[in-house]
A protein has these predicted regions:
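Glycosyltransferase specificity loop/lid
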Residues: 1-471
Length: 471
């Protein structure tokens, strides 16, 4: 029997970084013949860049319906951003409820961002199935599920534990320093918010994860075995990735023309996400490391955090070592603030990627078969680094990332990846990972099968509900 067309309302958390993965998920639903509406919370204190991003994404994806939901701002303007965001999302519940009730018919399911846990209450009130979309690694999900249970029992906060090993159920030991920044201080407001959110995610009917079976067998086994949520049922996890942006239409950025003129796999690409900015001292050290390596490079540089209020665009001549741009002009290109990363990582001239270990960037590199130099900066990136280096073995760690990376370290790791036998083995592993990733999203692949199973399970759940049964 053919599956009926479903309509999904996707509900991202605040910020562009949470919206873009939801757009990729909506595209997958559309490709399978279903409808998707993305409801975006729009508080009065929203970042203007977010509103601009919504407009761009809506224009680029006319088949996806975008709806802005006006919501109250957090009542505590002085609170930590994590708490303000949590307050805003909770206060948005009545707006979300009214939006859903104003539709011609209720959607078949709500798909919630991992931080939108309070929307579970709206779903329950309207008898809607609610699923979570987790845009990061399955390993992160396994750790997040278990944190509310084992962290309160530890003798100290992660920050105090430093490099001590933390043992999460079903996962390899992880150093405390690599746990997410927001939970480093257990008694802080951000940690309390995150632990509350992580504890509620298993209340969903299931979790869609942007990964694929082959990449994370250990984490997926821990989730399937139910060891991450003690004493409670673990929702089904559907691995439906990798979902990455194709970059849209050809951007025509000058860096792409420069890459066209470089030999194959000769360029080291450095890009650290939309929030990745370094001090002036660290920028100088990176420059010296790149110059010392002798390899070609493409480097996206942002204004140091301490100067962003005064200088939106970086002053490269002032920030980088004297004469650096002139000395390296034949081999390197430094770009201010932004590059079309999705296109750059796929370019045949790029041979290595120095990354902040954001999961979307990691998946883009895997899809390009590109070895990574791992330099985590914030959020769950320290965890991702552990999985990438120690479990998946698709990257090498840039030592010193917690405080300050020296030029000699960056130079050594660039040479290791670009010149040595170890770098060649890393490249071989990435070639296999790329092949497995492509297989996963093809017809009959594990991720395509998982998405079909998700739709089938939803259909069975809705049928059971209509018949008055519980599942």
């Amino acid at each position: 029997m053919a599956t009926k067309k479903k309509t999904f309302v996707l509900y991202p958390s605040l910020g562009v970084g949470h919206l873009i993965p939801m757009v990729e998920l909506a595209k997958r639903f559309l490709a399978h013949g279903h409808g998707a509406v993305i409801a975006v919370v729009d508080p009065p204190d929203a970042d203007p860049l977010s509103a601009a991003a919504v407009s761009r994404l809506a224009t680029a994806n006319p088949a996806i319906a975008f709806r802005l939901l006006p919501a109250p701002a957090s009542p505590d303007a002085a609170a930590h951003p994590v708490k303000r965001s949590d307050d805003t999302l909770r206060l948005a519940n009545p707006v979300l409820r009214d939006f859903l009730l104003l539709q011609n018919s209720l959607p078949d399911a709500l798909v919630l961002d991992m931080f939108c846990v309070d929307a579970l209450d709206v779903a329950a009130e309207l008898a809607l199935p609610a699923y979570f979309f987790f845009p990061s690694a399955a390993g992160d999900l396994a750790v997040f599920f278990s944190l509310p249970y084992f962290y309160p029992a530890l003798p100290a906060s992660f920050r105090e534990m430093g490099h001590e090993l933390v043992r999460c159920p079903g996962m390899p030991p992880i150093r405390a320093v690599n746990m997410p920044l927001t939970v480093q201080d257990r008694d802080s407001d951000p940690a309390k918010v995150r632990l509350r959110q992580f504890k509620r995610i298993p209340e969903g009917a299931g979790v869609l994860v942007n990964t694929f079976d082959w990449l994370e067998p250990g984490a997926l086994k821990a989730l399937k075995d139910g060891v991450c949520v003690p004493g409670k049922p673990t929702p089904r996890v559907y691995c439906i990735g990798p979902m990455v942006s194709d970059g849209g239409k050809k951007q025509g950025h000058e860096c792409l023309a420069w890459l066209d003129a470089q030999p194959k796999k000769s360029v080291v690409f450095l890009c650290f996400g939309s929030k990745g900015a370094f001090s002036a001292l660290q920028l100088q050290e990176i420059a010296r490391g790149l110059e010392g390596s002798g390899h070609r490079f493409l480097w996206a540089v942002r204004t140091p955090p301490e100067e962003q209020g005064q200088f939106p665009e970086p002053d490269l001549d002032r920030l980088l070592p004297e004469g650096f741009l002139e000395r390296t002009k034949e081999k390197g290109m430094v770009v201010k603030s932004w590059v079309p990363q999705a296109e750059v990582v796929r370019h045949e001239a790029v041979g290595a990627f120095v990354t902040h270990c954001g999961w979307n960037s990691t998946l883009e590199a895997i899809m390009a078969g590109l070895p990574m130099l791992c330099w985590p900066l914030y959020a769950e990136q320290g965890l991702n680094k552990v999985f990438m280096v120690e479990e998946m073995r698709i990257g090498v760690e840039v030592a010193g990332y917690e405080q300050f990376v020296k030029a000699e370290e960056l130079e050594a790791k660039v040479r290791l990846v670009m010149e040595t036998e170890e770098g060649g083995k890393l490249r071989d592993r990435l070639a296999v990972a790329r092949e497995k990733a492509v297989e996963a999203i093809q017809e009959g692949g594990s991720s395509e099968v998982a998405l079909v199973e998700f739709i089938r399970d939803l259909e069975n759940r809705n049928t059971s509900s209509e018949n008055g049964a519980c599942k």
